[in-house]
Curated annotation (Swiss-Prot):
Protein name: Alcohol dehydrogenase-related 31 kDa protein
Entry keyword annotation includes Oxidoreductase: yes
Residues the entry annotates as binding NAD(+): 11-34
Keyword list, A-Z: Oxidoreductase
Species of origin: Drosophila subobscura (Fruit fly)
Active site annotation, chain numbering: 152
SUPFAM superfamilies: NAD(P)-binding Rossmann-fold domains
GO cellular component term, pick one: cytoplasm
PROSITE patterns cross-referenced by the UniProt entry: ADH_SHORT (PS00061)
Pfam families: adh_short (PF00106)
Residues given in the record as substrate binding sites: 139
One example GO MF annotation: oxidoreductase activity
């Protein structure tokens, strides 16, 4: 179990919908500090959060997740002055706009990766940090394809690939930063907005989704925090239909283990065995 008591949490996402509900639950876990980085200031929401736990310090920065990494560094230098350190980084910024592929990819994937690359040095044990946990909030259509939201699905597949890659023991044993993901199923805040299919053939299905049964943001937020508390490095969870499921991960490439051993080996014989195994 991951104990959130006394932790310093940084949440990169709009303070509304799933992010707001997740933050509400975090505020009941006796965290010491909560930094919220979002594109638009939402003072009423922040006031609601502060009313839950007055002793928890809340900090806010207007933040564009698609900015260049050099600009991000300036923001997080300021964040660290207030936060001292970051125990938990939650990446929750998301966009589903099939008519704007660049914005969808930049928000959901590139921006998330740049955020992680910027924050990791502050957390890395070998660089003076204390280790910690990175939580990528993503979607179930990052696990299975969506014929309707193709660009969105592609970006979320990327989040899963990045999460699993960064969680490899190659990194975790060095930096002490665990990485996990929570894949949310259809949630009310998502289906309530106007949705466009990638191709016009899928628009009927996109329109129908607005009337489909889905989980509430409050239940989803609760399950995200529960997944964090149960987390281990490399885990992928599904938060859907009010429930929480830990995935059993599969390797589809049968040479994955051998290839990693080859990359880590300096022994010519071991390398020759790998080459022979590919034939």
């Amino acid at each position: 179990m991951y104990d959130l008591t006394g932790k310093h949490v940084c949440y990169v996402a709009d303070c509304g919908g799933i992010a707001l509900e997740t933050s509400k639950v975090l505020m009941t876990k006796n965290i010491a500090k909560l930094a919220i980085l979002q594109s638009v200031e939402n003072q009423p929401a922040i006031a609601r959060l502060q009313s839950i736990k007055h002793s928890t310090q809340i900090f806010f920065w207007t933040f564009d997740v698609t900015m260049a990494r050099q600009e991000m560094k300036k923001y997080f230098d300021e964040v660290m002055v207030q936060m001292d350190y970051i125990d938990v980084l939650i990446n929750g910024a998301t966009l589903c706009d099939e008519r704007n592929i660049d914005a969808t990819i930049n928000t959901n994937l590139t921006g998330m990766m740049n955020t992680v690359a910027t924050v990791l040095p502050y957390m890395d044990r070998k660089m003076g940090g204390s280790g910690g946990l990175i939580v990528n909030v993503t979607s179930v259509i990052g696990l299975d394809p969506s014929p309707v939201f193709c660009a969105y699905s592609a970006s979320k597949f990327g989040v899963i690939g990045f999460t699993r890659s960064l969680a490899d023991p190659l990194y975790y044993t060095q930096n002490g930063v665990a990485v996990m993901a929570v894949c949310c199923g259809p949630t009310k805040v998502f289906v309530d907005r106007e949705l466009n299919a990638f191709l016009e053939y899928g628009q009927t299905f996109a329109d129908r989704l607005r009337r489909a049964p889905c989980q509430s943001t409050a239940v989803c937020g609760q399950n995200i925090v529960t997944a964090i508390e149960r987390s281990e490095n490399g885990q992928i969870w599904i938060a859907d239909k009010g429930g929480l499921e830990l995935l059993t991960l599969h390797w589809y490439w049968h040479m994955a283990d051998q290839f990693l051993s080859y990359m880590q080996s300096t022994d010519d014989e071991n390398q020759e065995q790998f080459v022979s195994g590919q034939r």
